Amino acid sequence: MTEQPPPGGSYPPPPPPPGPSGGHEPPPAAPPGGSGYAPPPPPSSGSGYPPPPPPPGGGAYPPPPPSAGGYAPPPPGPAIRTMPTESYTPWITRVLAAFIDWAPYVVLVGIGWVIMLVTQTSSCVTSISEYDVGQFCVSQPSMIGQLVQWLLSVGGLAYLVWNYGYRQGTIGSSIGKSVLKFKVVSETTGQPIGFGMSVVRQLAHFIDAIICFVGFLFPLWDAKRQTLADKIMTTVCVPI
């Protein structure tokens, strides 16, 4: 018995042979007779992954999230502009701290002057005349005494720069202020003002001195107990 061909429209036609050189196969032709089979979608080029979604409105991609190990910068210290007067360091406490801070410098320079006076040399000249005999002596510092006095003076100056510049600018307190438990901070940030600004603050005390030292008395009546140098540098003294 001979086989009869299938009636038209029952089966889709066989797919065409693959194209040369590994090209993509063309989509199959539509089945005859409207059998209802839809052609498969064409394969995407490249790796076969779907394309990325379009960017959000405006055409800009959202910023990347922060790194897992990153730390946000710490907030600035609290401003202390509104503290009551009693919260600032009293004037007498600041005076006592100044005596403590300057004591090592005075001791070093004083030792240098004592050594220079003790080691000075004297030279005498005798004058003989017909009616009188006189002797004149002149004292002058020795080279060793002058050298020791100079070295101790430089050491005292280095101590002041370290104490009032580096130490006070870094932690807020010089030696005297640490003993009496208070510190110098910026009234806008509440933090120590740093080495350079601390040195400038000490130089600004010259203004307190040239007006007959009245600038040093300002903390007696000022609401924030500031000297003129404090007002210029926007610093205040507060207890630790």
From Swiss-Prot:
Q: Where are the transmembrane segments?
A: 98-118, 142-162, 203-223
Residue intervals of the RDD domain: 89-233
- Tell me which domain of life the UniProt entry assigns to the organism this sequence originates from: Bacteria
UniProt keyword Transmembrane, yes or no: yes
Q: Which UniProt keywords apply?
A: Cell membrane, Membrane, Repeat, Transmembrane, Transmembrane helix
Which residue intervals are annotated with compositional bias (Pro residues) in the record?
1-31, 38-78
The region called Disordered is annotated at: 1-78
Membrane topology reported for the UniProt record: Multi-pass membrane protein
Q: Does the keyword Lyase apply?
A: no
Where, per UniProt, does this protein localize? Cell membrane
Which InterPro entries is this protein grouped with? Pra-immunoreactive, RDD
Pfam entry (one)? RDD
Q: Which GO terms describe its cellular component?
A: extracellular region; peptidoglycan-based cell wall; plasma membrane
Q: What else is known?
A: Was identified as a high-confidence drug target.
Family stated for the protein in its record:
Belongs to the mycobacterial Pra family.
Q: What is this protein called?
A: Proline-rich antigen homolog
Identify the species of origin. Answer: Mycobacterium tuberculosis (strain ATCC 25618 / H37Rv)
> Gene of origin?
pra
